[in-house]
Amino acid sequence: MLVYQDLLTGDELLSDSFRYKEIENGMLWEVEGKWVVKGAVDVDIGANPSAEGGGEDEGVDDAAVKVVDIVDTFRLQEQPAFDKKQFVTFMKRFIKNLTPKLDAEQQELFKKHIEGATKYLLSKIKDFQFFVGESMGDDACLVFAYYKDGAADPTFLYFAYALKEVKC
């Protein structure tokens, strides 16, 4: 199994069990999340409650909770929303921190295409939920979630060049 870590913090952000599609000249990965129910346990112990005088559905309240699979699996932490000015400030710092960690070929491609990816993200800024990895580091890479038109499940966007592939 492959895990993708934040190159700046080492936080696990994604794995190969979630399929991605490259967009914006390979700058961003688009990943479909899913709402799932966590904690709902339906245990059949083989008893017949009606024959034993028991009521329907007696027992423990198992506190089922709906969560988004990617957020839950990688313990992503939601961040306050950014306005355009805050996002541009973040991007300047992010580019400054990430560029030295890339090899020469990656740096060239990153510098060539990051402006287009930034404009794409800015065009959707009001629709995003913002997440970072578990450590919530100041220099952490952002993960963006939004709902496509009519979608019931969120779509996540990752900065491809900020992910480091690790075999588990």
Swiss-Prot record:
Calcium recorded as keyword: yes
Molecular function as annotated in GO: calcium ion binding
Subcellular location: Cytoplasm
GO CC field: cytoplasm
Keywords, ordered alphabetically: Calcium, Cytoplasm
Main location: cytoplasm
Residue stretches making up the TCTP domain: 1-168
Gene3D superfamilies given in the database record: Metal Binding Protein, Guanine Nucleotide Exchange Factor, Chain A
InterPro entries: Mss4-like_sf, Mss4/transl-control_tumour, TCTP, Translation_control_tumour_CS, Translational_control_tumour_p
PROSITE patterns found in the cross-reference section: TCTP_1 (PS01002), TCTP_2 (PS01003), TCTP_3 (PS51797)
Signal peptide per UniProt: none
Family membership: Belongs to the TCTP family.
Functional description taken from the UniProt entry: Involved in calcium binding and microtubule stabilization.
Stated name of the protein: Translationally-controlled tumor protein homolog
Taxonomic path: Eukaryota, Viridiplantae, Streptophyta, Embryophyta, Tracheophyta
Primary gene name: TCTP
